[in-house]
Amino acid sequence: MELSDANLQTPTEYLKKTLDPDPAIRRPAEKFLESVEGNQNYPLLLLTLLEKSQDNVIKVCASVTFKNYIKRNWRIVEDEPNKICEADRVAIKANIVHLMLSSPEQIQKQLSDAISIIGREDFPQKWPDLLTEMVNRFQSGDFHVINGVLRTAHSLFKRYRHEFKSNELWTETKLVLDAFALPLTNLFKATIELCSTHANDASALRILFSSLILISKLFYSLNFQDLPEFFEDNMETWMNNFHTLLTLDNKLLQTDDEEEAGLLELLKSQICDNAALYAQKYDEEFQRYLPRFVTAIWNLLVTTGQEVKYDLLVSNAIQFLASVCERPHYKNLFEDQNTLTSICEKVIVPNMEFRAADEEAFEDNSEEYIRRDLEGSDIDTRRRAACDLVRGLCKFFEGPVTGIFSGYVNSMLQEYAKNPSVNWKHKDAAIYLVTSLASKAQTQKHGITQANELVNLTEFFVNHILPDLKSANVNEFPVLKADGIKYIMIFRNQVPKEHLLVSIPLLINHLQAESIVVHTYAAHALERLFTMRGPNNATLFTAAEIAPFVEILLTNLFKALTLPGSSENEYIMKAIMRSFSLLQEAIIPYIPTLITQLTQKLLAVSKNPSKPHFNHYMSEAICLSIRITCKANPAAVVNFEEALFLVFTEILQNDVQEFIPYVFQVMSLLLETHKNDIPSSYMALFPHLLQPVLWERTGNIPALVRLLQAFLERGSNTIASAAADKIPGLLGVFQKLIASKANDHQGFYLLNSIIEHMPPESVDQYRKQIFILLFQRLQNSKTTKFIKSFLVFINLYCIKYGALALQEIFDGIQPKMFGMVLEKIIIPEIQKVSGNVEKKICAVGITKLLTECPPMMDTEYTKLWTPLLQSLIGLFELPEDDTIPDEEHFIDIEDTPGYQTAFSQLAFAGKKEHDPVGQMVNNPKIHLAQSLHKLSTACPGRVPSMVSTSLNAEALQYLQGYLQAASVTLL
């Protein structure tokens, strides 16, 4: 792909088409661009378009496409081809900073993101001059350029907030601080001075305050891991200026917009974050500045309005107070009763009120409301911050705080009782205040795990929550209904079971509520209750206890999916899945109707998949339907195949990537349900499963391997007779998988199934080549994971084909190789094998080598007999060796490249653990004793002599125990 005008024209046309709303035009254009992105110069063509195109829409589109291209392809994944040639990488890094800084802001942001993606992989080792190039631009005096540098630096350095400490991180941050801290501080001071100079110039102030926000964010990132010496030495400069900015009020920077935070609010919010960071992590060094910041932030809180634009500022300011009041040596600032009352009255209660903006979100933007309220993304809301402050104050002042707030709760409930339809917000605030007060520790999985004992949660539930939920009208006071349901969710471990049981039909009833929030909360509450565990770790609620409600529960759950705004509601689908799981055979009478509804839903959502969690829970529900029904009646599998195969065919033909791994897992489950041979409908699919294109997607691999294993388990004879020409393709898949460090274990799963199930004569001609491939991989890239899998495989091979066959195949590849494998791999590494079935396979295989392999008794291999026995006793008795060499620690932790669909394991499609030696050997220790006894009868005197002279005392003692347990002796 040359950088010619003609070549620029083609991507321009296709980029235009990617913006077309018509999928018939848009998708082919997207596919075309994906198909050419592997060509050399492709990324440079996009950058050239950015520079030369006259059409601004094309420029923006090219910048987004370039960023996504970098996101998908820049990372070099081990065992995979480099997707961007080295020349293009060098050219991109040479040009991108200049291009980013000279572009308009909209494009600058995209290129800045691209730089940070490249930087995450290449900086500092492969891009050492990036920092110098950026710092030099500070001298330009052009704040468009300076802000571009700051924005890029922010996206590059913000990962320091989340990284674990390591030598590599320390080296990188030191390099960054040495190059960046002083120029950043000088820029900070210069920008503050310019703000004074241009105090009456609104447009100049807007640019300067944008810079100050980015500088403050960078301060946070650079100080997050440790307090750098430079910033400790310059704390006076930073903190004095931060304090000045916190108390600054410039009319020119105030906005009329009530929703969107202005620059002044954003800057003050970030400064509150910075002060909280220092108060929490560097309190000793920060101590002398703290009282000034507490005063400034308190004044800020009592003078800031209730408008939405101040939400982030107020929540960060409250979070600052929350972080301070939790520290033991600041508690004197809060211990006065008047101070606590004042905080409650002026900060906490006002910020717990349900505002008009919250009501609007509840009604019109329910998805976002639920995300914030249920999923904990409410980190920057006033209510969440106020709740955290209550918890912080309760750490040292639980009694006084509970007393003060109880008074507020009672007066709010009295106000509500006077006129519920007008004063319902008072009750909402009261419930929230009780929740904040009572919640000491909380997790998503278990709700409240530690509660304030001064609050009677059950009494509040009976008096103030149940009456709202018992009301006949599920659509009345929707916010209070949602509050009540959430109360059940949060305090499900504190409210007694009998009260929760009373709640279940009420929650089922609220699945019919028109409010998306209410019926979503009802579904979520039911799902959480159904997962609760009792004292014996069984589910707290039994199927028998829920039996009276089965029909109405299933009816209302599926009806809820038809309510406006909830057609792909993940909480409802998760509740369906959980109900199936809890109720088991009680759902069988309803399955014919429900599987039709699930199939129709699957067909609809597969046209345009947009809700991954919904899709996952739906697939789980389908698996549960199959499992539960076919457990009672295996012949019913045919009905499921009739219902599902048409939709599956459409998904596979349309290459719906999001659903293909699910389809393969469900098909595996269906196929495994067949007890006899493989139906012809499956065999027709078999050749297609071996197509290389399917195996190129990482997300498909585990599901495809599982499906091929099901084919091998159920139909190995059919494959050997009717599809023998496909065996090389099957082994080709194994060869591809074994070459990858990320997927080699999947290759072994497949190989083990081939060895275990295929008729020996069908794979005879390929056996030697299989071993050669494995040895090549061992030679080129030996990892702990590979060795463990290799050990299981050779022992399974030994069990299947015999110990002599294993010795002969090794020595057939290279003379004396069998001895090398024993000495260098089996004996020293067997301790690393994990998993009960895997250990059992290895134990039975090694027992065969010891007792059924003549060369082990009368050749040069005899010297390895006792060390091999010693290693087997070690496998039985010693702890597993789970040490991993340093260089391998991150070998399996690979991000899924780019936008490929990651594999999502379906729990209810799960394969039962298969034990290939289960029928042959029950107890491998007894089996070893019996096999040694048998060997000793064939060669009297030799085995006791070898054992007593070479086995260490501890191992010998264990062995004598096995012999006694088996009631045998060595002759």
UniProtKB/Swiss-Prot annotation:
Pfam families: CAS_CSE1, Cse1, IBN_N. This is Exportin-2. Belongs to the XPO2/CSE1 family. Signal peptide: none annotated. Found in a complex with CSE1L/XPO2, Ran and KPNA2. Binds with high affinity to importin-alpha only in the presence of RanGTP. The complex is dissociated by the combined action of RanBP1 and RanGAP1. Interacts with CFTR. GO terms for cellular component: cytosol; nuclear envelope. Export receptor for importin-alpha. Mediates importin-alpha re-export from the nucleus to the cytoplasm after import substrates (cargos) have been released into the nucleoplasm. In the nucleus binds cooperatively to importin-alpha and to the GTPase Ran in its active GTP-bound form. Docking of this trimeric complex to the nuclear pore complex (NPC) is mediated through binding to nucleoporins. Residues 29-102 form the Importin N-terminal domain. It is found in: Cytoplasm; Nucleus.
